[in-house]
Regions:
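Short, small-residue-biased leader/transition segments that mark boundaries at the very start
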Residues: 1-6
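Conserved class I S-adenosyl-L-methionine
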Residues: 74-77, 99-120
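Class I S-adenosyl-L-methionine
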Residues: 113-164
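A short glycine-rich, Lys/Arg-flanked "PGG" loop and its adjoining helix->strand segment in the class I
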Residues: 80-99
Length: 164
């Protein structure tokens, strides 16, 4: 996005599966052939459980979780990137004013996430069950491919913003 191009911020895209990461790298390469350079965008293939081993305390200002795997089975709840276990990991690397922004079209995962934010003692700064009809929350929204796809199918997009 143009936000990334013009920004003095660094972005790190983290993906556990190399096939997904490969697609991101191919897209970046295509943009660069079009003259769009994303020098401040890096990618890492890793398990997000290792975040505290990769980033220093307070090093990360924002964590964007976009259309994460919902892990629908109850026994897999701890694998969800918005579980209290993951919020504890984010707590270790977020700057004092840091925050987590989460988007999904999966209502069950979103409701689970709202509960986990509260259970972890985090503050819910904003949330909506229908992002594309909330002007205030749409401001500065960067549409992902999944967001465009699900939204065009009529699926409402849920979003929350949380801080500690």
């Amino acid at each position: 996005s143009s936000d990334v191009c013009s920004s003095d911020l660094n972005y790190v895209g983290i993906e556990m599966y190399d096939s997904v990461l490969l697609r991101a790298l191919q897209k970046r390469e295509k943009l660069e052939t079009e003259g769009i350079h994303l020098d401040n965008l890096k990618f890492m293939c890793m398990d997000a459980r290792l975040l505290p081993e990769v980033f220093d305390k307070g090093e990360v200002e924002r964590i964007y979780l976009n259309f994460s795997d919902p892990w629908p089975k109850a026994r897999h709840a701890k694998r969800r990137l918005t579980s209290r276990e993951f919020l504890a990991r984010y707590n270790e690397i977020l700057a004092p004013e840091g925050r987590v922004e989460f988007k999904t079209d999966n209502r069950d995962l979103f409701e689970f996430s709202l509960e986990e934010v509260e259970a972890a003692g985090w503050k819910l700064m904003a949330h909506t069950f229908d992002l594309h009809h909330e002007d205030a929350m749409m401001e500065g929204n960067v549409m992902t491919e999944y967001e465009e796809k699900f939204s065009s199918m009529g699926n409402p997009i849920c979003k929350l913003v949380a801080c500690r």
